[in-house]
Amino acid sequence: MEELCLKLKQDLENYFSMPFEIQPVFKDGEVHYVCSPYNEDQMYFSVEVYIHNKIRLVIEIYPQKHGGYILNEMAHAPEEKQSTFFSYKQMLVDKGLKSCYSVNKSDLLENKWPITWRTFDFKMTKIPIPDNVNECESILVELVRYSFELIFSLLTITDISEEEFLQKAVQTEGTIQEIKSIRYERNPINRKLCLYKKGYKI
């Protein structure tokens, strides 16, 4: 249990360059791993992952206790981000995950995006899962990372290193279109979708 917590924490922090908190919770005799970007005020969202009945991998994504800001930002995501979100969702479906996404207790549809989000509940399942423990844990860690990418695709996140890069690019490149192109290519979510659409295995 502690080893898997460490694997999840290291993978997420190395990939996203931000601190994460992993909490193991026992529910009905099963260990649930609750993962979230580190914040003391519980203002973001959590990804909860567990193995159910030893045959099904389950991922649930939901806002934290004081996640109103995140709900508002997701609700007002521009159409470009909404499109990226649904493309990523389809990619996960093509990887064998069954999904159920609801907002305000109604199905979230591409042509019906609520402008007010009071709550959201995204659930994905994968069955069957490998019998080999190491292989199963590798899939679990990978799918948790994908789950965070799914939500991050709707949010505006810019790190300092990227800002510094863009400032230098403005001085050398000089056009808005080139800067937008650089930003897009450096975004790991966009890059992953591009590779996926071109038929590369990711």
Tell what function each PLM region has:
Residues 1-173:
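Extended charged
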